[in-house]
Amino acid sequence: MGSSPKNTEAGELEKAEAVKLFAHPGIDFPTILLAVAMWAGLVANFAWAAGVSEWTAWICLRHILVGTFFLNMSFTIWHEAAHGTVFRARAANDVLGALTAWPAMIPYFTVRRDHNLHHDFVNDPERDPDFWFLEGSIWSLPFRYPKGAKRAVEIVDRSGRPAWEVNLDRFLLVLVLVALGLGIWLASPLAVLFAWILPKGFAMWIHAWYVNVLPHRDLPAERFHDTRIYTQAWLVPLTICHSYHGLHHIWPTLPWHRYPRAFRLKRDFLESRGVPIFPRSKTS
């Protein structure tokens, strides 16, 4: 028997929605707005901290929390830029990526290549540069960081990256050191510590949890089976939609703010491929 007109029409509408949803946005304004919000928040927090004359426990905590909140946005922005989803031009994506990885003290061109290798070899103990995140407790991450970061850079170096990427990252690192020095001189060491350095550490730890450990731990290095999707609504604002990370590994150029809609549209396909989805109920 043929499909009914209603079913045919519904199928066509779904196909049209999918084409629009998975198309490049041209200019991804939600990500640009996130970048503006991040920079505005970080600058305001540091200016606020610069005016502090007496550092009580509450004031220290206040600036750590505000700084961590805004630095949590950094990953999403440079990650989108690394995948080329913010602009069509690669150079424009790289400028935005470098500008938004910089306050998190992340060498953008190194991490861009690292991330592409991660996608190529997800959960491979030898070739995934991010596998070290999964090799111990999330609580021990700060102690494992130097060794893990060194291993990741070694894998990136073996990929044959050009000298200009290395030199640009070194230049950006020098700018970080200059900014730290200026911050200490113009404000105070405590302002730099509580409004920038500690928030950077906490934001990196949070990213490791929801981008590496939560989606990838104890999963095989197999397409469709290597990354989880969590559909709980409360995780969406906390992770900036990266609770749908399994969706990203299948369609890496899908913008972050489209993940929930894309999941609803593609859930049957994802389940048919055995993608780990939590919770299992379709009411989620």
Provide a role label for each language-model segment:
Residues P30, I64, L71-N72, A208, ...:
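Alpha-helical hydrophobic/aromatic positions enriched in membrane-embedded helices and signal peptides
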Residues P199-L238:
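Alpha-helical transmembrane anchor segments
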Residues S74-G84, V111-N123, V211-P220, L238-W256:
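Histidine-centered catalytic micro-motifs
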Residues H24, V86-I106, E126-G136, E222-L235:
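Juxtamembrane helix-capping/reentrant segments at transmembrane boundaries
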Residues A98, W209, P237, R261-L265:
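Generic recognition of well-ordered alpha-helical segments
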Residues F87-D94, H115-D120, R144-E154, L219-Y230, ...:
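Juxtamembrane/interfacial segments around transmembrane helices
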